[in-house]
Amino acid sequence: QNKVRGNLIRLGGFAADFVDRIMEPIVGMAEPFRYRNKAQFPIGTDRDGQPIAGFYAARTHSIIPVEDCLLGVGENKVILDAILEYMRAEHISAYDETTGKGLIRHVLIRYGFTSKELMAALVINGTRLPHQEALIQRLTQIPGMKSISVNCNRENTNVILGEETICIWGTPYITDDIHLCDCSDDRFIQ
């Protein structure tokens, strides 16, 4: 709380007496895990050429495989496992930033805490997803799945999403009780 107060005064330029008058006590989270409603995972390959999902190592583009991030919902792991299994079974390649080759670049997942609806979006380096019915069959087995999309990003860029998103199953959005806003893959909601 003192750090926030100090930053408001030092960085924000607010008068100390003003901050002291309006600032309320900071309340911690009752449960500091599994609270994120959106996750995005880069897709790459391990040393054996097998597809992996994870996070970038600090200040690099090297992917550290992550089986489960405790900030995201448990369904993230189930969805990633299904996508990686699909990639292995159908011989779908992961994107390689160095060569610009390979198909699957990222996976974005959204979860509606009130609606219990799930959205999965695959960002691809192409215009179509081979054997997409096999992927749909896997993902629709997951309770709550409402939306499966493919986003096309063929640019050599570190921007995750491309211009075009195609809903390949379900609806192009999920709904949650955030003032009943439709949540698509490119919207920021927290």
What are these regions (language model features)?
Residues 1-190:
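Accessory RNA-recognition modules of RNA-modification enzymes
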